[in-house]
Structure formats: structure tokens, C-alpha cells
Amino acid sequence: MPEELTPTPETAVVEAGPVSRWLSENGFENTALERDHLGVEIVQVDREVLLPIAAALFAYGFNYLQCQGGYDLGPGQDLVSFYHLTKVSDDASQPQEVRVKVFLPRHDPKVPSVFWIWKGADWQERETFDMYGIQFEGHPNLKRILMPEDWVGWPLRKDYISPDFYELQDAY
């Protein structure tokens, strides 16, 4: 009796959603990823094409950056910058959503800033920079927002080692 092959996450074929198909039809290279637990479509793009794709999605109606954030896949692995976009309109009973992910090499975590498309990215990109060290090129004021200016390292990276001591000077 032949052994049945069951797809694994690495081999499973993900059907492209409407946004991924629209991007592909308009010449924007992307990869459809598995939808999240709420059914939100997720697309992966390269950092070199993030800005043109972000501008195209804005023109396509994704006028609200609900959330920008980052996460670490683990020591020695990629960092991820993600963008949760929503189409907001007066007549939408269920707004369309999409999440765009950019996987960045740990040794060179640079991605263009989307601040010039969605102004709400300002503090969100700063927080992601502060916690993960992802550099948002073209951001007008990329500096720490949560940690002290002289803090060393990126506290939410999985390979981060907490300092034994940090002296807070001129705190009062």
C-alpha cells in the first residue's frame, strides 16, 4: 500500500488571495503566504519593491495602516517587518484587510520607510527600530522611542543579552 503524502507547511501550496492576484496582474512580484487565524490574506514582498507595492496598495484603496510591527524568527534567522493594511470607506460593512511581510536578513535589516505613504507609520516604525534594530530608510526621525538614547542592543531580538547594569543618569 503506497504511503500517502501529506503536505507540510513547507510543501503546502497556498492559493493566492485577491490582493496577491491583483498585485501579480499588475506586475508586482509577491508570494502568497498562508492566511492568519482570522482569514486575513498575507503576502510576502522583497524590500526592494516594498515602496512601489505600498503605493499601489494605497492607490488600490488600502488607505489605512492599521499596524506596522516587527518580529524575530529566532537567533541567526530573519527579522520580519509587517504592515497590516485596511480599506476604509463609508459603505464598507466588512473592510478588506491584507498583511504585507518583508523578511530581512539579520545582518542587514534595512527596509524603506512607508511614512511618506501612511503618516501613521511614524511612531510604529520607530518602535520597531527601537526593539528590533530594523532600519527604516528615509524615515524623517528614526531614533529610539521607548529605550534611552544610549541603550545598546535591540531588546526584543531573541538573541539579545540583557545588560547586568544600566545606570540612569540625570533622571530627576
From Swiss-Prot:
GO molecular function, one term: quinone binding
Source domain of life: Bacteria
E.C. designation(s): 7.1.1.-
Subcellular localization(s) per the UniProt record: Cellular thylakoid membrane
Family as reported in the entry's similarity comment: Belongs to the complex I 30 kDa subunit family.
Signal peptide: none
Gene Ontology biological process terms, A to Z: photosynthesis, light reaction
Entry protein name: NAD(P)H-quinone oxidoreductase subunit J
InterPro entries on file: NADH_DH_suC (IPR010218), NADH_quin_OxRdtase_su_C/D-like (IPR037232), NADH_UbQ_OxRdtase_30kDa_su (IPR001268), NADH_UbQ_OxRdtase_CS (IPR020396)
UniProt keyword list: Membrane, NAD, NADP, Plastoquinone, Quinone, Thylakoid, Translocase, Transport
Function, in words: NDH-1 shuttles electrons from an unknown electron donor, via FMN and iron-sulfur (Fe-S) centers, to quinones in the respiratory and/or the photosynthetic chain. The immediate electron acceptor for the enzyme in this species is believed to be plastoquinone. Couples the redox reaction to proton translocation, and thus conserves the redox energy in a proton gradient. Cyanobacterial NDH-1 also plays a role in inorganic carbon-concentration.
Cited SUPFAM superfamilies: Nqo5-like (SSF143243)
Pfam families per record: Complex1_30kDa (PF00329)
Quaternary structure (record): NDH-1 can be composed of about 15 different subunits; different subcomplexes with different compositions have been identified which probably have different functions.
Catalytic activity: a plastoquinone + NADH + (n+1) H(+)(in) = a plastoquinol + NAD(+) + n H(+)(out); a plastoquinone + NADPH + (n+1) H(+)(in) = a plastoquinol + NADP(+) + n H(+)(out)
Its membrane topology: Peripheral membrane protein
UniProt GO cellular component terms: plasma membrane-derived thylakoid membrane
